[in-house]
UniProtKB/Swiss-Prot annotation:
It comes from Anemonia erythraea. The keyword DNA-binding does not apply. One of its GO terms (molecular function) is toxin activity. It is found in: Secreted; Nematocyst. GO terms for cellular component: extracellular region; nematocyst. This is U-actitoxin-Aer2a. It comes from the Eukaryota. The lineage of its organism: Eukaryota, Metazoa, Cnidaria, Anthozoa, Hexacorallia. Keywords: Disulfide bond, Nematocyst, Secreted, Toxin. Contains 5 disulfide bonds.
Amino acid sequence: GEIECSSSECCPSGKHLCKGGFVHYCCPNDRYMSCGILGFGTCYCWKADYYEYGSTPTC
């Protein structure tokens, strides 16, 4: 499922904080995060068919 992201002081400019269960990552703010089936897979920042790894929040 898609995980909504929101702006946060814990992420650098241009990235939003995405919270998926125990996983918190910063994704580019034009993407959403998904952690695979049931949310237990590897989390990626998605946009259409393209994905990248999220970065670790600073706080």
